[in-house]
Amino acid sequence: MSWGKLSPKANNVMIICHALSGSADVSDWWGPLLGPGKAFDTDKFFVVCMNSLGSPYGTASPVTAKNGDYSQGWYGADFPSTTIRDDVRLHKLVLDKLGVRKVAAVIGGSMGGMHVLEWAFFGKDYVRCIVPAATSSHQSAWAIGWGEAQRHAIRSDVKYKNGRYGFDDPPILGLEAARMTALLTYRSRDSLERRFGRDTGNKKKTQQQDSKTIPNNGTPIHSQGGADETPVAFDRADSNFAAQSYLRYQAKKFSDRFDSNCYIALTNKLDTHDLARGRTRTIAEALSLIQQPTLVLGIRSDGLYTLAEQEQIARAVPNAKLREIVSDDGHDAFLIEWSQLNWLLIGFLHENLPDIMQRAAL
């Protein structure tokens, strides 16, 4: 998807990279940053977001019809493995087709941050500056372990059938268990404790505060939200605590909009991420090849892609600076702390893209 206009010189492109379960519709998950006068200024930038391979929201994935014909079935578990690097190379071909000559900035968090770092290797003459947030230079053993636990939950569902399930009877329980596990890595202990504690809660109150909506065309990434709002009731006799109700509701909301084989494909993709692969002997050497001005955004309470990992990136990239998103909400803070993000991004863009930021609207 795109917003704004491509400049006559085709050099004002801003690429936004989505996270694991997001889509190309930036307005659904980073909406407060998109628009005139905001970080993703549509009066000045041609803002572009493209879906990753394996995502159910576009490009190609396990839910893609074979030969474009669903009567022949869909790829399902036979969908080939893809990497972060594959996505970036594919997206570069799209920009080439559009006649883009130069990318002004690439911005993304989590899985999107991995894409951002890969974009940098096209060189500073093509990509002018980058902003990786809450991400890593390579998938850590810690993150690989969490991904495997989630895949195991899906594969343990009797309806998974080695990935040969039908759309009419998918392995919902396995996907919901995977989502619950993931949600706990996206938040922090203090965040959940502050929000729920040992509250058993009033069911109606819990519905109003935590159930909110299911997005019918849904694309929120880790946090809840979305454009279409459909009220949902949630009632489980064994939901004694508000934290349980929250996890079960969010898992159900996710299973209504996502596919299990896609989830497996995308989490496997994360595990392939390694900037040094095929390039250098070490991660530090690979990062040292990134020459663009780089704003690394980290979150001290992030237990999935830790602040230490952001510090590693900032130390090794020659022209990088690290800024902290202040929040106790964990990994998801990069999707929540919009005012901080807007301020940090606008400052960085003014510093490194004055020719675009200071000119009149297109």
UniProtKB/Swiss-Prot annotation:
GO terms for biological process: homoserine metabolic process; methionine biosynthetic process. Keywords: Transferase. Its EC number is 2.3.1.31. Fusaric acid is phytotoxic to plants such as cotton and banana. It has been shown to induce programmed cell death in plants. In addition to a mild toxicity to animals, fusaric acid exhibits acanthamoebicidal, antioomycete, and antimycobacterial activities. Pfam families: Abhydrolase_1. Residues 208-222 have a biased composition (Polar residues). It catalyses: L-homoserine + acetyl-CoA = O-acetyl-L-homoserine + CoA. Residues 195-232 are annotated as: Disordered. InterPro entries: AB_hydrolase_1, AB_hydrolase_fold, HAT_MetX-like. The active site is at 110 (nucleophile), 302, 331. Pathway: Mycotoxin biosynthesis. It comes from the Eukaryota. The keyword Transferase applies. GO terms for molecular function: homoserine O-acetyltransferase activity. Residues 12-335 form the AB hydrolase-1 domain. Belongs to the AB hydrolase superfamily. MetX family. This is Homoserine O-acetyltransferase FUB5.
